[in-house]
Amino acid sequence: MTAYSGSPSKPGNNNSYLNRYVENLGTNVTPPLRPQSSSKINSSLNIASPSHLKTKTSASNSSATILSKKVESSVSKLKPSLPNKLVGKYTVDLSNYSKIELRYYEFLCRVSEVKIWIEAVIEEALPSEIELCVGDSLRNGVFLAKLTQRINPDLTTVIFPAGDKLQFKHTQNINAFFGLVEHVGVPDSFRFELQDLYNKKNIPQVFETLHILISMINKKWPGKTPALTNVSGQISFTKEEIAACKKAWPRIRDFKSLGTNINTAPASPEEPKEKRSGLIKDFNKFERPNIPVEEILITPRKNITDANCSDFSNTPSPYNEAPKMSNLDVVVEKRKFTPIEPSLLGPTPSLEYSPIKNKSLSYYSPTISKYLTYDTEFYTRRSRAREEDLNYYQTFKYSPSHYSPMRRERMTEEQFLEKVVQLQNICRGVNTRFNLYIQKRLLNLFEQDILRFQACLRGNKFRVLSSMYLPIRRAKIDVPHVEAIQSRIKGSRIRYKYDKLKFTLSRFSCTVELLQAYCRSKLLKTTVNTKLNDIEISHYPLTKLQSYMRASYVRKKVMSLNTKLNDERESIMKFSAIIRGNVVRCSEDAILSAVHDVHKENISKLQSLIRGIFTRSCLASIIYSLGKENCNIIQLSACIRGNAVRHKVQSLFAPENNLSETVHDLQGLVRGILVRYTLDLVDDIVEYNNLALFQAFSRGALVRESLDQKSSFYKRNVRSVIMIQSWIRKSLQRSAYLELLDCPNPSLWAVKKFVHLLNGTATIEEVQNQLESCQASLDSENMKKERLLKSIRQQLNINGVLDKFGLLKDKDHELGISDSTIPKSKYQKYEKLFYMLQVDPSYWKLLYLKEPEFVAKNVYMTFGTVNQRMNDRERSYFTRFVCEMLQNAINEAPSIESFLDNRSQFWQTILQDFLRRESPEFFSIIVPVLDYLSDPVVDFESDPYKIYQEIHGFSSPQHCSPVDDASTKNKFIDNLRCLWHAIEMVAEIYTRKVHTIPVEIRYLCTKIFCYAADKNIEEIDSLRAISSILVNVFVSEYLVNREYYGYKDSNVQKNNQKIDILMKSLATVFEIKNFDGFLDPLNQYANEIKPHIKDVLYNVLVDPEYEQEGDRLIYLDMVSPSPKLELLTEKVLEISGKFEEYLNEFPEADILHDILEKNLDNSSFPRSGRVTLELDASAYRFLVSDDKMRKIYDQVKRAFVYMMQIEDVDTNLYDLSISTILPQDEPNFANFLEQNPKIRDDPMIQKLKPLKYFTLKNVTLKKIHELESTGTFCSSDNKLQNFLNDIANTIKNPNYAIDYVTQEIYITKETLTKISEMNHSLDIELSRLKKHVDHTIKDFQKAKDFSPVHKSKFGNFKNAVKKVQGRERSELQGMKFKWNTKQLYERGVLKTIRGEKLAELTVKVFGSSGPKFPDIIFKISTSDGSRFGIQMIDKRKGPDKRYSDDVDSFSFKDLIKTQVEPKIETWKLFHSNVVVNNSQLLHLIVSFFYKRNAL
């Protein structure tokens, strides 16, 4: 980093290239500000009335005029106000600052200069310099927008005010300032980016841009703005302020200079000034001085002399120290340049690079570039203005197009090459001169170092030559003790130096002690205050938390009891009822039994008396009631007797009525007999006279006559008939061809016309088998890689265990393996699980069917880190998950109409969340529509009654229609126009900016189109499915949730009503439906736009290459560094636990069972915070079932190809599959096979036994049923239209499927090769690590002596006696140590002994005697350090002795392996009677056998 050498405005920092660049800026560097165009969608008929706009414009012009007058007076009369920190001219002592502090001081001076200038222009006070550099006062861009509006109000009309917090809309203010920078012509290298200011990435770059902008304005438009004031040395800053600036911006550099003189005297105030709306009205008119012809720059040639002929007299005598030079002695010679041709300084500057990508300086060949000559910068700027300008749709005028005169002529290849060569020469010259200038600046910075280096070189050269030409003869002098004398001299010097330092320090000993005491006291006070503050802060919350916890504990206890009682409530109630019933019954039974025994006869008599009394009272009441109705009863009996008499009288006339019915029946029978007899008689007469034969002859004659007439007519017009037939066939073939190409769901009739083209084409089975073989090999290689990585990590962990116990003498630095080759894999099973959750969306889909709320809450975080955007890889995988949920929603919907009507589906919610998090920048596309809706003049109300009431203030009369009112009618028409204009604005987004739509949205549109086509054969339903994403998801997200993106409405409720109406209208238009109700007049426009809407919906679809790239991601993950996923610890455990809970729902052969077969180890997880998972791609397995379904699907498709050529069915494939086989179908199938011998080689045809059409159809139906059972499709819903669509696509591109599989085979082989190479290198590394670990263990085992201690003669005599007496035990060989049970237990080695109570406390009369241990001795020995023997000796006697002497063994390497993954905590020895702790046992072995010298 270079240091500041003063103000960039000083003359000493000239940059000739940038100076000439500013002076030579052409008049057409940027297009002049012009009123923006009014396109078709911005027509005044569709937006607002002219009177309103005219009033608004005049008001802005008047305010601009007043502002310009105020600015002119301030510029001509006032000088810029200086800051309060100014202490006079060059009165600040800069010697107190260090070198680094001086750089930040100069930087703050530049900030102060910019602050003074802006305050003078906008006449408003700005915050302090430190606040501007470190704070957030500039981030909202309000001051920059005010500066832009002050200089030229046309550049910004609206300034978004500063609020309580930073919002997205504040970027409009910064973009307005970028317009000022663009029109002034600041070079790209001096401009800052939006994120430098908005995200506070590089604030120093912002001030550098401002400094350059001010310099260029003062240079090009002198007198328009105040001059820039140099405050270096005149303003003071405290060291705390400089430290704060340094902390905020650790790296700063000096400002680049344009070489302009900022102190240029302003123009005379007496000059007449034009009336303008700002300080600078036209940026194309500025003062341009004449370019002086400079002298030719002569590069000084370096005087290279020969080393052998050099003159030593020129070398200074003192060679050990370079002479000091002052910076003032360095003469800086002004560079001289050759005159520049005037043609190169024409209207277009040679080095003016537009920030917009331009094709005018294309690297295409001349033959291609000549077709791009009309793509001028004007159209590029115009398109950029349409995309970025938020007020573009509020304008109403177009300005005439300006074409460059040079662009009107088409250049030849020679002219183009000449211009390119000329431009390249100019660029190379400028770059060379700029590099020379930079090198000179670097040399100036390192002048002292270079001078010292040159002096050292000259001295070294002189010494070398002196030794060559002037050899010094030295006599050999042997002085004894020279080294001792030299060391004594050096020692005395060092002691003298240290004594001097001690004496110097002793002078300030009191001060040092006081300083130390003060520091210690300060530290102690700080610590005590911190603890007191912590106690004071946490006391109240802690007591409150404790009370909450106690209350929560009590409530939980009460609730648990209440819950248990509620669970048994019914049983308790039944039990209590039974008890009460038993008590009552017992008391009653006791009373009855007592009474019954004493008064049995009296009770029976009493009962008979009561019954008699009750019966008599009932009879008396009945008799009494009948006595009151005695007269009525007499009358009723008289009526009954009269009715009986009348029935007897009527029965006398019954025979006559029966006779009449019998007569009628007899007459009917007679007439029937006569009619039948007549018909039989007529039939006999007809048969006798051959009437049927006569009729047949007559009909035959008529038919023959008609056929003769037709035959003669055909013979006379045979050519015409053939032509008509050919025309008909041609027309049918053409219509079938167009339907096949254009229609997404062609009919069976159209496909049958061209299905014969697929006869003899190659099948996919062979390449599919090859792909399965490659994928199986890839799976095996992945498993091998997983095993190798596991083994390598185990060896590395063993090496770490050895290092932990200090058994490594020389650490091998070659053991380290880069993270890209071997991931750390701290959480291996979690990394596999979350990789599968990303790659395979079926897991989330199955869990969503069980736990939809859980999936909605947690699925998004498994694809990306919190508060960070997804990468392309994660976006692709997440899009696949949305597709899976989308397909599931379509399959579960009863019909495509019900699916489209449901606006609250899960896939829509997660897609809107994806747009909100990952694509907020696309909100700028919808901003013009929102600005149009926010206009108070725009209204979408279509109800004439409401319009009438809104205009007149009262309801319309009942006797007349509100449309009869002229004002209501005009308002109704204007509202419909406004609504249709908003619809056109949205349609224009999908027409002109279709490529700006996220590719994920377009891919989902493609997939939903295919899913809808498979669900329903109607084309219109597929297009409506596309519109459900474009309108109900994409547009709806940005319109409805506009506040999230920082857009503020003046009337939120009114705009919500407009958006609701607009969304319904957009759905009607894009779903190609008709308006109803009051919006019916819009149908004429909707019908005209329907073909255009269809084209728009089709243009949104993406090519299959995008999906193929997504399929290749899995292979890329296998050979790339492991992708990382950062999640909260609790979320990782929660998600993995949920999948463990539903593990049985997944297929048994699924890889998820292998991952979750054991409980996931979460002991290494941090208790809180985040966990970074390195996802393991080797966990993925290619499913054989999917490949099998693909084969079956292809076989069914080929079977339908053959069946369409056999049977004559034109409805759909479902009818073809279930149709009855006719007798002629079998011969037709045999002839079909004879005519197409290649079809006989089809493996599917060869497997037919017998080879008949019936067998083919039967096998095909079974395969269709198998596909339906797997959920691939539903034949009853779409009538097998998906097969027909696939056949039609195969006719269009017959080799697509085979090419796709072939390409996948190629990628699989490449991946297999790379993984094999990785496995080979891992295998080599594993063997190296194993050898290293074995060699290390053997080395430190050989370095130790494990021979036993020499025994005495008595010991040998004892062994001999034991052998003779037969009391010999198995003795351990080599070095041995023994411990009792207590020692091993206290060391943590011994865990348990079966049947023994270790460390049991026994209480005696006088108190406890401490823990007791069994008298068992353990001896451990080894003879080579590799294998250890352990002996257990039970010293107890009598019944207390439980174990006989036993011996067990273990290897040291096995003991080390227990300390690495998977760790084994304990071992069971001596027939599982003794349990030991492996970690403590290893520590014991190392301490006593390998490090016994350290004990």
Swiss-Prot record:
GO biological process: mitotic actomyosin contractile ring assembly; mitotic actomyosin contractile ring assembly actin filament organization; mitotic cytokinesis; protein localization to cell division site; regulation of actomyosin contractile ring contraction; regulation of cell wall organization or biogenesis; regulation of cytokinesis; regulation of mitotic actomyosin contractile ring contraction
Domain called IQ: residue spans: 447-467, 538-567, 568-597, 599-628, 629-658, 687-716, 717-746
Residue(s) carrying Phosphothreonine: T264, T299
Keyword annotations of the record: Actin-binding, Cell cycle, Cell division, Coiled coil, Phosphoprotein, Repeat
Domain of life assignment: Eukaryota
Residue ranges of every copy of the Calponin-homology (CH) domain listed in the record: 108-221
Pfam families xrefs: CH (PF00307), IQ (PF00612), RasGAP (PF00616), RasGAP_C (PF03836)
Domain remarks: The calponin homology (CH) domain binds to actin filaments and is required for their recruitment to the bud neck. The IQ domains provide the interaction surface for the myosin light chain MLC1.
Protein name, as recorded: Ras GTPase-activating-like protein IQG1
Organism: Saccharomyces cerevisiae (strain ATCC 204508 / S288c)
Lineage start: Eukaryota, Fungi, Dikarya, Ascomycota, Saccharomycotina
Gene: IQG1
